[in-house]
């Protein structure tokens, strides 16, 4: 996918939103979602979509699962018929999220990022990592659907994407493209994938966002994080300085990408 040109779309992508893993999970607690932040972000995304889609103020949940937040199946069919989000096929939104406290533990102890699927521990860790990150993806999709956003989870591994160590290697964007053109909001996540050089690796949400921005050519790319903006070093560093202005050049972009705190 890295070598391909812009993917032809019948409808343009308006925005790619990257949800930082540190913004939607508690990174210091194993597999713990920050429910408050996730709810706030889901609400803000719905409100942003409403500005361009004339969505009604009343939110109609698309989460019909039996759980503590929504124990009853819908009975008002007209509520869905009158919801522009379910009629609008021009939403043009793609969401990518980091793993946060999901997947990192499993990937770290098994060294999935170093490859070597011939090793039993690496293969076991690959499976465990995917179970963890897809669990988070499911919960984020659930939260978005609760706000009436027609979101669908897309896993890089299931889409056939591969890595080239830290970058996307081969990958077919047709599934994502078809989802967008059908009026859905794809929700993609960092994932354990097969690697062209070392057998397997971790494909981060940041690498996915960068590649999708290149191939889909959106109007905007928005990063939602747990910090105030872009710093000259990891924000956890006491000497970190918030950058008020950024001069755009290719050299600086790549340098900034590798300095960026992994979310």
Residue spans for each PLM region:
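N-terminal glycine-/serine-/threonine-rich phosphate-binding loop
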Residues: 1-94
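Generic structural signal for well-ordered, non-membrane alpha-helical segments
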Residues: 8, 30, 34, 38-41, ...
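Short loop/turn segments at strand-loop or loop-helix junctions that form parts
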Residues: 17-22, 98-99, 156-157, 190-191
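Generic hydrophobic/aromatic pocket-lining and core-packing "Φ" positions
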Residues: 38, 45, 141, 176, ...
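Generic secondary-structure signature for well-ordered alpha-helical cores
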Residues: 43-54, 141-150, 181-185, 218, ...
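Ligand-binding beta-strand-loop-alpha-helix segment within the catalytic cores
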Residues: 65-92, 106-193
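A structural preference for short, pocket-lining loop segments at secondary-structure junctions
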Residues: 91-103
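Active-site phosphate/oxyanion-binding loops
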Residues: 104-122, 158-185, 190-263
């Amino acid at each position: 996918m890295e070598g391909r040109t812009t993917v032809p779309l019948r409808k343009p992508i308006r925005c790619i939103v990257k949800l930082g893993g540190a913004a939607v999970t508690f990174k210091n607690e194993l597999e713990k979602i920050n429910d408050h932040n996730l709810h706030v972000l889901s609400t803000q995304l719905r409100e942003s979509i409403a500005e361009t889609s004339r969505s009604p103020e009343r939110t109609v949940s698309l989460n019909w699962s039996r759980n503590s937040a929504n124990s009853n199946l819908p009975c008002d069919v007209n509520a869905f018929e009158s919801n522009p989000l379910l009629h609008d096929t021009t939403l043009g939104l793609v969401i990518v999220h980091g793993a946060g406290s999901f997947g990192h533990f499993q990937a770290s102890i098994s060294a999935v990022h170093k490859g070597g699927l011939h090793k039993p521990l690496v293969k076991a860790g690959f499976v465990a990592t995917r179970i963890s990150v897809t669990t988070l993806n499911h919960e984020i999709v659930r939260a978005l659907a609760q706000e009436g956003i027609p979101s669908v989870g897309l896993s890089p591994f299931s889409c056939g994407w591969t890595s080239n160590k830290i970058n996307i290697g081969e990958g077919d964007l047709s599934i994502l493209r078809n989802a967008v053109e059908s009026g859905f909001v794809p929700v993609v996540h960092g994932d354990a994938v097969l690697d062209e050089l070392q057998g397997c690796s971790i494909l981060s949400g940041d690498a996915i966002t960068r590649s999708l921005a290149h191939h889909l050519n959106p109007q905007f790319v928005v990063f939602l994080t747990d910090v105030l903006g872009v710093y000259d070093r990891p924000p956890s560093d006491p000497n970190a300085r918030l950058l008020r202005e950024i001069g755009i050049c290719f050299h600086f972009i790549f340098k900034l990408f590798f300095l960026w705190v992994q979310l």
